[in-house]
């Protein structure tokens, strides 16, 4: 049996912290306003994985009202969510992440992002795709106010 999940997340810029995307620190003058580290891509991917096996979403599993997740490393959240996916009898066939950002440019970091996700999901890097696009200066991402991300996860029964 196969299962598919979709995730979406968005965070605004504005906090003095490192900008984390796909578990990689991307040099930029500001970070995200968020309860955790704000890694918009890993949050979308976590939602996709959880959604594929009907385990809700990142907010259900790691509520922002719980102080233990304050400034949490989103890689740890992803790894825990994937542990729960595996407990349901599924593993990743492939994942696809789309980062929607006017700035900063993601291209120099894509390979590292793919490898980081592959490491966290215990899969081959060829099962992980990460890409970035702009909104041609339209909307909040186009104005440089934040970043959005979509993710899709295809899971197969172990």
From Swiss-Prot:
Coiled coil: none annotated. Its EC number is 4.6.1.12. Pathway: Isoprenoid biosynthesis; isopentenyl diphosphate biosynthesis via DXP pathway; isopentenyl diphosphate from 1-deoxy-D-xylulose 5-phosphate: step 4/6. Keywords: Isoprene biosynthesis, Lyase, Metal-binding. Its cofactor is a divalent metal cation. Binds 1 divalent metal cation per subunit. Transmembrane segments: none annotated. One of its GO terms (molecular function) is metal ion binding. It catalyses: 4-CDP-2-C-methyl-D-erythritol 2-phosphate = 2-C-methyl-D-erythritol 2,4-cyclic diphosphate + CMP. One of its GO terms (biological process) is terpenoid biosynthetic process. The keyword Lyase applies. The keyword Transcription does not apply. 4-CDP-2-C-methyl-D-erythritol 2-phosphate binds at residues 9-11, 35-36, 57-59, 62-66, 133-136, 140, 143. Pfam families: YgbB (PF02542). Involved in the biosynthesis of isopentenyl diphosphate (IPP) and dimethylallyl diphosphate (DMAPP), two major building blocks of isoprenoid compounds. Catalyzes the conversion of 4-diphosphocytidyl-2-C-methyl-D-erythritol 2-phosphate (CDP-ME2P) to 2-C-methyl-D-erythritol 2,4-cyclodiphosphate (ME-CPP) with a corresponding release of cytidine 5-monophosphate (CMP). Homotrimer. Belongs to the IspF family. This is 2-C-methyl-D-erythritol 2,4-cyclodiphosphate synthase. It comes from Actinobacillus pleuropneumoniae serotype 7 (strain AP76).
């Amino acid at each position: 049996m196969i299962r598919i999940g979709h995730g979406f997340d968005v965070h605004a810029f504005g906090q003095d912290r490192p900008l984390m995307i796909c578990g990689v620190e991307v040099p930029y003058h500001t970070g995200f306003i968020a309860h955790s580290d704000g890694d918009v891509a890993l949050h979308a991917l976590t939602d996709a994985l959880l959604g594929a096996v009907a385990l809700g979403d990142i907010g259900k599993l790691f509520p922002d009202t719980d102080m233990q997740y304050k400034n949490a490393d989103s890689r740890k959240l992803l790894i825990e969510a994937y542990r729960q996916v595996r407990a349901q009898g599924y593993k990743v066939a492939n994942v696809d992440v789309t980062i929607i950002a006017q700035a900063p440019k993601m291209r120099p970091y894509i390979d590292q992002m793919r490898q980081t996700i592959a490491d966290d999901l215990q899969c081959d890097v060829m099962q992980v795709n990460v890409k970035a696009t702009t909104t041609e200066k339209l909307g909040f991402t186009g104005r440089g106010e934040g970043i959005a991300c979509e993710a899709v996860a295809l899971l197969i029964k172990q």
